[in-house]
């Protein structure tokens, strides 16, 4: 905590950035002189698809669906697309500078200002939004930031249309965000998870661009600083994000975004050694990179593809002096052809295009263009606080930890295997969010259950949720991790110990050993393995999975194959394709003490 306080006292010193000189405005020669022409044309073309397009209202009947049916995606699709429309038009106008997009932007701003609430029904307590209920959450803060950035970048042109519109923007952001944020002791201000920095990064933008009362501005900055300190203090020293790589983008990356806005850190800032935790938090994202465009997808990951948005990843690596991060971001940009397809990356940079982050990124575009690209493929990673090990080859990741993590799945001791950077044994991830996802019924969802991870079903019991259900690290050395996962199961499972060892061996093999002792025998023990590749039971002792083989002792184990494809929703089908399978290997013996070994080749 002392280090966090000292760090933020340094990072928040130069509050002269309130002068709002962070980004050149519309008409500044920077946008035509510094941004490559091909990138500018990409942004312009992206915006042109929205010229003369109607601004849809968001139907209250669709908003109410969440409370009535549990569906949250119907409203999200409509809301996110409307924000995308504005973000695309603003960037196009900024790049072209001919006022061609301004009428649509002004109409879009007015349409959003007329919305009752800027957030999602999943985060609202009644079935329809009320004008007087403006609690600050993720997406109304993010909408506010989009409007605030638009106001700043295009202030002269908006004022040219009508100074009253500038006043209306300030009034709405004050009413919806600035006043309730400063007056209310929201739970997320002290949280050690993504809501804290995600909201703070957007709150900070609203303060910088729309707060004109210096007393309130000073208090808001103080509160944002305090919230950042709370977030950093709660983070482990190893920088691991227990919410998974998917949420890193709105956890550690949003912390950096907040600090960047409040201080506008210069490239000559000397942040070491006080930023060791921030550096560790930053590096987590490439430490979880597998290769071939895949990333480790523990916790609530809506995909297993690499999740680095270069518009925040590159500035993060630049400011912290992390060459690996910078080169990773440039490599992603090269793979995605950012010079010609900049708008495609911009479009994918959030639930809708992240205007603020794109503006941050473009300040450093010339440095980016002269950077060497390099795909990060670390041989081994060990995060002792999060209890995650990765090793290669083949690529293996295994996690310990506990079952009370943010966006938790009951997955203590689970592993994934990606030979040559391709999925073989996988974590299914998470499907579409519904009203169940963050409710008491969360663990009714199959993707949250240990029986649908690469884990044992012991004595008839699955793992339990809660921080008390955890692993103990027994041994770690490069390429090998032994965990006692007995603590992740309820006492009724009658486990003395269950030692799981995952070892990467020469010849591109992974060996898994299960050494266990039970107090009593109640039901057959089973080993579960999840794979998108159809398993074939060709002969006793081997299971063929495409070009790979799972070898086991047929005197110990009886395998069966279950097609779990019917469980997949649209999100999971997009991740894994048309099929997903579960291998169940049932132990033949009822002995209380056993050792079982199987190998992936």
Predicted features by range, described:
Residues 1-20:
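Bacterial Sec-dependent N-terminal signal peptides
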Residues 21-67:
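Low-complexity, Ser/Thr/Pro/Gly-enriched N-terminal "stalk/linker" regions
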Residues 47-58, 105-123, 164-186, 219-239, ...:
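Long, well-ordered core segments of solenoidal/helical folds
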Residues 81-95, 107-111, 141-152:
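Non-membrane alpha-helical segments in proteins
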Residues 93-106, 150-171, 207-225, 262-278, ...:
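Structural helix-adjacent loops and short alpha-helical linkers that scaffold large soluble proteins
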Residues 128-246, 254-257, 369-376:
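Active-site lining segments of carbohydrate-active enzymes
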Residues 253-425:
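Carbohydrate-active enzyme catalytic cores, enriched for enzymes
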Residues 301, 337, 342-345, 433-601:
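CBM-like, beta-strand-rich accessory domains located in the C-terminal region of large
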């Amino acid at each position: 905590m002392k280090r966090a306080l000292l760090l933020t006292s340094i990072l928040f010193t130069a509050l002269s950035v309130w002068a709002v000189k962070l980004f050149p405005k519309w008409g500044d020669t920077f946008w035509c002189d510094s941004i490559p022409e091909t990138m500018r044309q990409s942004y312009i073309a992206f915006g042109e698809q929205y010229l003369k397009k109607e601004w849809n209202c968001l139907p209250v009947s669709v908003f109410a669906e969440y409370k009535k049916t549990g569906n949250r995606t119907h409203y999200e699709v409509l809301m996110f697309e409307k924000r995308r429309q504005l973000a695309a038009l603003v960037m196009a106008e900024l790049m072209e500078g001919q006022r061609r997009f301004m009428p649509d932007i002004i109409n879009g701003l007015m349409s959003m200002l007329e919305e009752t609430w800027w957030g999602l029904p999943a985060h609202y307590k009644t079935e329809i939004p009320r004008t007087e209920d403006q609690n600050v959450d993720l997406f109304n803060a993010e909408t506010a930031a989009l409007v605030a950035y638009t106001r700043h970048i295009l202030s002269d042109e908006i004022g040219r249309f009508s100074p009253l519109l500038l006043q209306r923007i300030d009034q709405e952001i004050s009413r919806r965000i600035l006043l309730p944020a400063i007056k209310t002791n929201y739970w997320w201000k002290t949280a050690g998870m993504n809501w804290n920095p995600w909201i703070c990064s957007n709150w900070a933008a609203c303060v910088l661009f729309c707060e004109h009362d210096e007393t309130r501005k000073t208090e808001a900055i103080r509160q944002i600083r305090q919230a950042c300190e709370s977030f950093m203090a709660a983070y482990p020293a190893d920088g691991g994000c227990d919410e998974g790589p998917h949420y890193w983008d709105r956890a550690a990356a949003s912390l950096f975004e907040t600090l960047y806005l409040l201080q506008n850190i210069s490239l000559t800032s000397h942040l070491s050694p006080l930023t060791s935790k921030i550096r560790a938090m930053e590096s987590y994202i490439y430490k979880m990179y597998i290769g071939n465009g895949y990333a480790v997808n523990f916790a609530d990951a809506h995909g297993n593809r690499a999740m680095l948005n270069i518009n925040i990843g590159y500035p993060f690596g630049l400011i912290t002096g992390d060459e690996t991060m910078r080169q990773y971001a440039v490599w992603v940009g090269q793979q995605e052809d950012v010079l010609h397809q900049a708008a495609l990356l911009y479009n994918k940079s959030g639930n809708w295009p992240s205007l603020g982050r794109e503006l941050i990124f473009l300040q450093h575009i010339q440095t980016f263009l002269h950077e060497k690209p390099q795909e990060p493929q670390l041989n081994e990673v060990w995060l002792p606080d999060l209890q995650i090990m990765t090793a290669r080859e083949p690529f293996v990741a295994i996690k310990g930890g506990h079952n009370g993590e943010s966006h938790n799945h009951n997955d203590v001791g689970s592993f994934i295997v990606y030979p040559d950077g391709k999925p073989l044994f996988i974590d299914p991830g998470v499907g579409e969010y519904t009203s169940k996802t963050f409710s008491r019924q969360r663990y009714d969802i199959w993707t949250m259950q240990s029986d649908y991870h690469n884990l044992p079903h012991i004595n008839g019991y699955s793992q339990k949720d809660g921080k008390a259900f955890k692993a103990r690290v027994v041994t770690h050395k490069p390429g090998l991790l032994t965990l006692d996962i007995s603590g992740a199961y309820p006492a009724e499972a009658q486990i003395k110990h269950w030692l799981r060892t995952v070892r990467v061996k020469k010849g591109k093999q992974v060996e898994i050993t299960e050494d266990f002792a039970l107090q009593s025998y109640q039901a057959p023990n089973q080993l579960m393995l999840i794979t998108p590749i159809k398993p074939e039971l060709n002969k006793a002792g081997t299971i063929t999975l495409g070009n790979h083989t799972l070898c086991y002792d047929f005197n110990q184990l009886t395998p069966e194959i279950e097609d779990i494809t019917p469980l997949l929703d649209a999100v999971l089908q997009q991740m894994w394709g048309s099929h997903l399978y579960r291998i169940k290997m049932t132990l033949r013996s009822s002995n209380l003490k056993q050792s079982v070994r199987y190998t992936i080749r």
